[in-house]
Amino acid sequence: MTSSSSPSRKALSKIACNRLQKELSEWQVNPPTGFKHRVTDNLQKWVIEVTGAPGTLYANETYNLQVEFPQHYPMEAPQVIFVPPAPLHPHIYSNGHICLDILYDSWSPAMTVSSVCISILSMLSSSPEKQRPTDNDRYVKNCKNGRSPKETRWWFHDDKV
């Protein structure tokens, strides 16, 4: 997998283009609550504004997600990261990488950008405290040069937050 900063990213397949155009059309009609697609002319890279849910630690806070779609989306998961500054959360690293199983091992082609966004908002909303992952400094140090979070071998051990 190439990093997000790689200029050699492959063009989307016809299936991926059709799927993303459909998802974008549906999003424009019925966006998930708390999210706003920031319009660009690049179907392969979306920027999505996330607003924390009312009554949570992140209420009224706004963050940006960057979603990069691989050539064979939806058969392959998109790369989803928070554009720094990332929210303080036990599963979100300071470089924006997100430890969430559906972005990696548990990805299914039935998932959509909307369902991923809802999962991320749910993860934020359920957090009882704002803090970085305990291994944040070590992980970020090892992710230099724009390494993709999809190159990480994640260990999903905590589903409480």
UniProtKB/Swiss-Prot annotation:
GO terms for biological process: protein ubiquitination. Keywords: ATP-binding, Nucleotide-binding, Transferase, Ubl conjugation pathway. Its EC number is 2.3.2.23. It catalyses: S-ubiquitinyl-[E1 ubiquitin-activating enzyme]-L-cysteine + [E2 ubiquitin-conjugating enzyme]-L-cysteine = [E1 ubiquitin-activating enzyme]-L-cysteine + S-ubiquitinyl-[E2 ubiquitin-conjugating enzyme]-L-cysteine. The active site is at C99 (glycyl thioester intermediate). GO terms for molecular function: ATP binding; ubiquitin conjugating enzyme activity. The keyword ATP-binding applies. Pathway: Protein modification; protein ubiquitination. The keyword ATP-binding applies. Accepts the ubiquitin from the E1 complex and catalyzes its covalent attachment to other proteins. This is Probable ubiquitin-conjugating enzyme E2 18. The lineage of its organism: Eukaryota, Viridiplantae, Streptophyta, Embryophyta, Tracheophyta.
